[in-house]
Curated annotation (Swiss-Prot):
CDD domains: HATPase_GyrB-like, TopoII_Trans_DNA_gyrase
Originating organism: Mycobacterium leprae (strain TN)
UniProt lineage: Bacteria, Bacillati, Actinomycetota, Actinomycetes, Mycobacteriales
UniProt binding sites for Mg(2+) 1: 462, 535
Reactions mediated catalytically: ATP-dependent breakage, passage and rejoining of double-stranded DNA
Keyword annotations: ATP-binding, Cytoplasm, DNA-binding, Isomerase, Magnesium, Metal-binding, Nucleotide-binding, Topoisomerase
Protein name: DNA gyrase subunit B
Note on cofactor: Binds two Mg(2+) per subunit. The magnesium ions form salt bridges with both the protein and the DNA. Can also accept other divalent metal cations, such as Mn(2+) or Ca(2+).
Site (Interaction with DNA): 487, 490
Gene (UniProt): gyrB
Amino acid sequence: MAAQRKAQDEYGAASITILEGLEAVRKRPGMYVGSTGERGLHHLIWEVVDNSVDEAMAGYATQVDVRLFDDGSVEVADNGRGIPVAVHATGVPTVDVVMTQLHAGGKFGGKDSGYNVSGGLHGVGVSVVNALSTRVEVDIKRDGYEWSQFYDKAVPGILKQGEATEATGTTIRFWADPDIFETTKYDFGTVARRIQEVAFLNKGLTINLVDERVKQDEVVDDVVSDTAEAPVAMTVEEKSTESSAPHKVRHRTFHYPGGLVDFVKHINRTKTPIQQSIIDFDGKGAGHEVEVAMQWNGGYSESVHTFANTINTHEGGTHEEGFRSALTSVVNKYAKDKKLLKDKDPNLTGDDIREGLAAVISVKVSEPQFEGQTKTKLGNTEVKSFVQRVCNEQLIHWFEANPVDAKAVVNKAISSAQARIAARKARELVRRKSATDLGGLPGKLADCRSTDPRSSELYVVEGDSAGGSAKSGRDSMFQAILPLRGKIINVEKARIDRVLKNTEVQAIITALGTGIHDEFDISRLRYHKIVLMADADVDGQHISTLLLTLLFRFMRPLIEHGYVFLAQPPLYKLKWQRMDPEFAYSDSERDGLLETGLKLGKKINKEDGIQRYKGLGEMDAKELWETTMDPSVRVLRQVTLDDAAAADELFSILMGEDVDARRSFITRNAKDVRFLDV
């Protein structure tokens, strides 16, 4: 990819196939970009960037530039071949076909198209971006000239030929339509994380991200690092300077010569590896390619991330199945052959072997089959056997060639197996339970009367006193209450046997009914709303983070499917004389309600006019219902998982052993400690 290929004739007007127009896109944007909220808005950037990355994957581009402007527009530029400008068979310039016809793109022409591999089926990309924008400008360098075109609500102008040039490439700038999207404000952190991921997956590709919206004197959190190396140990003076220094986000350059090796370094940068080298290999087949990088660390959680044609396959798929099968088989055979396991000993399980494993599996498939509309699970059956064969051959070679590291890996897996066996009694308490079977539920659970999971809610509440108020104030038809006594165990620092001996963890897993890890079965979930309700202070936030860490590490699909929420209890109660009280959820809202009320002639109680809630236990049942539990007025924040790798790193920093990394993160993000969106 690093060496640019000059073969524009391979990607010309004849490579473009038209399937249908854009009429339906503006009517049903959610079908094409997922939503009209923030996620859908950012999807516009992904579609344009993916097209530039396709040029890089095909070997024609080495650099992509992404720029966020003050006027809400986004510009994506690459130095690829440039979108064709020749007249298409339909009689219009090919660039107009690409920009105005749904599914029109070189990637739909099979072996005769401009691409052998592309990012899934996002050939709908630029045309959908055009359909959902008020204006799009396209500048092309191709065929010896500069070309420019614009689109007003997807209607093309006249293609203009400019000055002569020997350069090639495409620049697309678009303005998302505010009448379609709920917001047109892009989040730098979201964009940076996705672009960093793309750079990791495309070894040697340079991606520049510039945020023109940041003023020179504005202090912004450094939300992403563009280095894959582990942090260098700092002196006390350096730590002090680093903690107090403002982090300005204006320009980030992502360039990883090591590709997936750098990705694994990045994942493990706050952890302690148990082997010196990173395992790195690749393989090619008929219409398939696979690349793998992996390294074990001293932690207890696995961090395996899979991609197909640079698309993050959150739900895994056949490529992950092939990798897992090969790894489990190779490690068990090696352990038996080297007498690290006795012949009579049971085999190590996949969970045992993957404990502490950081791995990235990236496949390129000429004709990918993604299950569902979201493209998060690869379905190509032939990919499993291909990946399994490559991984089997390469892992056998690595284990034989690295006996010291191999022994450390096997011993860690054996230690994990011993912990698993020791936890067997505890695990029996958290076996999967039927969605309607109430047997064996924890005694402190106040269950709801409904047996329909779709309408049932579970409030996990901090403290018995708050749990009592919640039980009294709830609607017992559909709301269940599970009170917790104090802080649960930090699963980031404990092995599964210790985790499953914790009574609070037992109660949570048993109440949910799904089981954990490989036993997890989402169809057995007893509640489709799991609401974490803790005090609105630092201790409450810590408890919420502990609970989220448990769910992320042991029952991640609950988050992926959108079943987990954070309750938003009020911070203040304003008591007016001879009038109903009002509740404020922040300092600014308190000040606003007070100012408005006084202007309207209201009088605040003199002695206890403004009450600050120190905890949920200070609210009676009626207040808790009216402010935090009544579906008609409550505010719930849904916990989402857009980037598993970023979330994995975040939980490792917040709940892991690296104190310096945690201090640095908290210092940079101190201004927004109210809520951390995972």
